[in-house]
From Swiss-Prot:
Residues 356-444 form the CBM3 domain. The gene is celN. GO terms for cellular component: extracellular region. One of its GO terms (molecular function) is cellulose binding. PROSITE patterns: CBM3, GLYCOSYL_HYDROL_F5. Residues 332-358 are annotated as: Disordered. It catalyses: Endohydrolysis of (1->4)-beta-D-glucosidic linkages in cellulose, lichenin and cereal beta-D-glucans. Pfam families: CBM_3, Cellulase. This is Endoglucanase N. Substrate binds at residues 64, 68-69, 95, 130, 230, 262-263, 290, 295-297.
Length: 444
């Protein structure tokens, strides 16, 4: 990033507006990774916050089972997901049964490879103890405690690591009967070596019964409760459970969801998926999509034969993958999704100024002079001083800067008096670059 902010090239290309627009935009510098930006995560009043106490929403992708599609879990693919898709979290799904860790403990090496890649790339990573056909997490509780003792010993000082200790308890297994007692023991094992990294705990009925967990929460303050859904099968009743759990102060993490039905294959159901994503973003609930694979099923993100190392074009993505990529890229421009908001419809001015028709005044203010935080934060005020209303949708603002050879970017709209959901941001490359400006942020 061009760090001397008073020397950054600032070039604004304006359309015209109908009313006063006040915006505060914060841009993580291109050298700042998600972990550098947010640091140690924790739970505060049932919501996920970063080390500055600011609410944060994680959005990313899960691997498929490592025993089947582990080749897609590598630094190159994860880097592409970070830089092109905009993920800030990756989930590595290590099955316990079905030729998973219990019969093939060497799969732990792939988990370690994924964690090392995530550390290097500065993204958060979920280590997923993926129980499924084994139903009850207590079946392999001893192995879980051994595994998570090793993971916590290795990564207890790494703020990007998140432990998911029971993917989808099912088969009549209940929160109070089996899951909570198991979670207490495994949490104690983790906390003996790692005092503060996040822990995600699955809930009953394939991680749908978060209401039961909300009514009898675990004592650990940095625990989240998993809800899983598949858009073609699960609808409003599960969204209602999220609202209920949040009203009880429980922190919720959608650590797995799919655009398909619950089989993983029917669909994809994109309108239903959009309803879910809008809801999760509105409630500030973090989410991870299933899954990074080229398997011939609706929930797969990649088309059959896609490269194992990223670089995917539109043709390499499935219908689901294209949709999820769009959602993650759009979500990277949200202000964290922490406060439910209703988009505001811009209105025509009732008392326009006396200036010449179409006159536009733009005021820019730098609100961050700290050279050590790798961020650009700005406030922009735009006013139509003419006598004729002009549409806000005609407005474009470009902010030019140099990326210093680091292509990743995190963009956030902190506030806008027309509602942050009505502001769209993206990055682009100018036709003619200079040694001081080779990128721009477009605000519309």
């Amino acid at each position: 990033m061009w760090m001397r902010r008073n020397q950054i090239v600032r070039k604004l290309t304006l359309g015209v507006v109908t009313t006063v627009l006040g915006m505060s935009l914060s841009f993580s510098a291109l050298s700042a990774t998600p972990v550098e930006t947010h640091g140690q995560l924790s739970i505060e009043n049932g919501r996920l916050v970063d080390e500055q106490g600011k609410r944060v929403q994680l959005r990313g992708v899960s691997s498929h089972g490592l025993q089947w599609f582990g080749d897609y879990v590598n630094k190159d693919s994860m880097k592409w997901l970070r830089d092109d898709w905009g993920i800030n979290v990756f989930r590595v799904a290590m099955y316990t049964a079905a030729d998973g860790y219990i019969s093939n403990p060497s799969l732990a090496n792939k988990v370690k490879e994924a964690v090392a890649a995530a550390q290097s790339l500065g993204v958060y990573i979920i280590i997923d103890w993926h129980i499924l056909s084994d139903n009850d997490p207590n079946i392999y509780k001893a192995q879980a405690k051994t595994f998570f003792a090793e993971m916590a010993g290795l990564y207890g000082s790494s703020p990007n690591v998140i432990y998911e200790i029971a993917n989808e308890p099912n088969g009549g297994v209940t929160w109070n009967g089996q899951i909570r007692p198991y979670a207490l023991e495994v949490t104690d094992t983790i906390r003996s070596k790692d005092p503060d990294n996040l822990i995600i705990v699955g809930t009953g009925t394939w991680s749908q019964d978060i209401h039961d967990a909300a009514d009898n929460q675990l004592p650990d303050p940095n625990t989240l409760y998993a809800l899983h859904f598949y858009a073609g099968t699960h609808g409003q009743f599960l969204r209602d459970r999220i609202d209920y759990a949040q009203s009880r102060g429980a922190a919720i993490f959608v650590s797995e969801w799919g655009t398909s039905d619950a089989s993983g294959n029917g669909g994809p159901f994109l309108p239903e998926s959009q309803t879910w994503i809008d809801f999760l973003n509105n409630r500030g609930v973090s989410w991870v999509n299933w899954s990074l694979t080229d398997k011939s099923e609706a929930s797969a993100a990649l088309a059959p034969g896609a490269s194992k190392s990223g670089g995917w074009t539109e043709q390499n993505l499935s219908t689901s993958g294209k949709f999820v990529r769009e959602q993650i890229r759009a979500g990277a421009n949200l202000g964290g999704g922490d406060t439910p908001t209703t988009p505001t419809t811009p209105t025509e001015p009732t008392n326009p100024g006396n200036g010449t028709t179409g006159d536009v005044v733009l005021q820019y203010r730098n609100v961050d002079n700290n050279p050590s935080d790798d961020a650009i934060r700005m406030a922009v005020n735009i006013k139509n001083t003419g006598s004729t209303p002009i549409k806000l949708s005609d407005l474009q603002v470009r902010y030019y800067f140099h990326d210093d050879g680091k292509p990743g970017a995190n963009l956030f709209v902190d506030w806008a008096n027309v509602g942050p959901n009505n502001i769209v941001t993206s990055t682009g490359t100018p036709a003619a670059s200079t040694d001081k400006a080779n990128r721009y942020v477009l605000v519309t």
